[in-house]
């Protein structure tokens, strides 16, 4: 009666409203069942010290049948779930009574070895003898079962073998397919040229030089020319060689010709920096490709792909050295036939954390147009940071004794003095000498997290010096806040 009264009062169609209520009840029921399933899975994994977040990730992949699936083969966790290692899957398997010589264990171990070494060293394959030696050592089994497992994985198509003369190269199918598809796409693009007269390009360069009050070197001008003439281009060079100047010139020249330009970089920080120096919006590659919830066979789903390509005439990717082969596969998938791809980076800088050393391999292949910048410009020559970067690259020792420049070395015999020395540099010496603000204009980089000079300890010390608590400050310490739905990216909080 209550529903009928409400329906008549609101002038709604009765049958339609009942259908809405029915759908709502079904949605509530599905959500309830899902939460029950998640709770059971979290409790199941809790005894193996698997975090709730990882357990939820497992549920999203395998659904309500997760527990029997894992009990039947725990190694699917290492094979298919990012964040769950082979060691953890092996621990679960041993507790469930799996044998050390079982095929599923050895096969999963082999795949994890290829993944791990690929991520560490930038490889996409390993020599067969290397895999066998690593597997025998890690799994503590004899060579015969390992060779049998490799043969079965090759027959099933999970691994791919290519003869390299002295040895067989063994790939995960994922890496093999990605590398092949990227290579084929880039080679096709390298054969595409755009019919535009060099004198027309030079006129555009002259106009940009005049407006921006800059003067390009001949090598830089050639890079801009090739950006107009070819569909795939690499621009590489060390620090201070003018890569950013070229990017800006290409952007402004392309805009004069009414070309739609997009900028992207592998990380949020690199994209932010690119935006700042170019005065033009840059996105992370994941954001550019419109990453969506869920995973596919290569770990992520993107709305932009071969069926829904990026709508641009020119795509410029900075910090290409950090792009791995899987991300590159997604990126090239999303390029339309009209899009020029300009890859900018220094192959001697930070490599990707994933498999593949994409930029270096592209340069070494000599299959893609590549402009190498070697001249260090006047302003960069005055920086000992740039000079020493090139010295190290050339196998020379850095110059450490110029305390009047922007690169100097501070020696301490006692490691316990290091935190206070770093704090003194940030609070007193650098701000006084260079006129910098200790909070907004100085960064401290450290390779560790938990040591004496690690992130956690230094942050505590620097906060107490640079931003100490005060009754005058409108702040209080509370529980951590989790952002679940905001346009906030990693390291921006």
Predicted features and spans:
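Helix-hairpin-helix
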Residues: 1, 15-28, 45-59, 76-93
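Positively charged, polyanion-binding regions of nucleic-acid-associated proteins
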Residues: 105-124
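ASCE P-loop NTPase helicase motor core
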Residues: 221-224, 229-403
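Short acidic, hydrophobic short linear motifs in intrinsically disordered regions
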Residues: 122-135
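Interdomain "pre-motor" coupling segment immediately N-terminal to P-loop NTPase/helicase cores
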Residues: 141-197
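Conserved small/polar residues in nucleotide/adenosyl-binding loops
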Residues: 1-5, 16-24, 242, 484-492
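Dynamic helix-loop-helix/coil hinge segments at AAA+ ATPase domain boundaries and subdomain interfaces
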Residues: 207-217
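Conserved helicase motor core of P-loop NTPases
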Residues: 347-482
